[in-house]
């Protein structure tokens, strides 16, 4: 999965480096692999799995940069299940929600409450732009990115 993600532009370079450093050691790689497998394929409610995944990422070995960031905890499920899961870039998403008039419940500490709020925001956007026929949450994420980015 780390190789798959490295082919995207979803994570900033400092996040990619922090992840690579975290999984260099056998124990870091094992912790990451088991945690990611449980998050993607484990049993139980998504909220509980998400919280466990955040704990795993928070426990990964680190050098200088923190590994536990919103982009890092959301990117892998977004790649694996774009029909139902979305990716969070905090600044852009917060600005997009503000522009959209959506009360996005954001916390800088990754956790289920914020992610559940993001999924609600995605559902609202999907409903509102249904005539544009978004195929999945990649399309919704793209819409959010354009709305919240000052580049467009």
Language-model features, listed with the residues they occupy:
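An N-terminal alpha-helical hairpin/helix-loop-helix interaction module that forms a charged
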Residues: 1-66, 82-152
């Amino acid at each position: 999965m780390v190789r798959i993600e490295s082919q995207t532009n979803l994570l900033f370079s400092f996040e990619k480096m922090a992840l690579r450093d975290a999984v260099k050691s056998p124990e870091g790689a094992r912790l990451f692999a088991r945690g990611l497998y449980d998050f993607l394929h484990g049993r139980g409610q998504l909220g509980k799995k998400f919280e466990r995944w955040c704990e795993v990422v928070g426990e990964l070995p680190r050098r200088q940069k923190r590994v536990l960031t919103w982009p890092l905890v959301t990117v892998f499920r977004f790649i694996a299940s774009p029909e139902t899961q979305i990716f969070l870039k905090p600044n852009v998403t917060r600005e997009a929600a503000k522009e959209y008039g959506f009360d996005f419940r954001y916390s800088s500490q990754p956790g289920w409450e914020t992610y559940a709020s993001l999924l609600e925001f995605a559902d609202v956007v999907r409903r509102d732009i249904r005539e544009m026929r978004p195929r999945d949450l990649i399309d919704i994420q793209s819409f959010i990115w354009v709305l919240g980015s000052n580049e467009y």
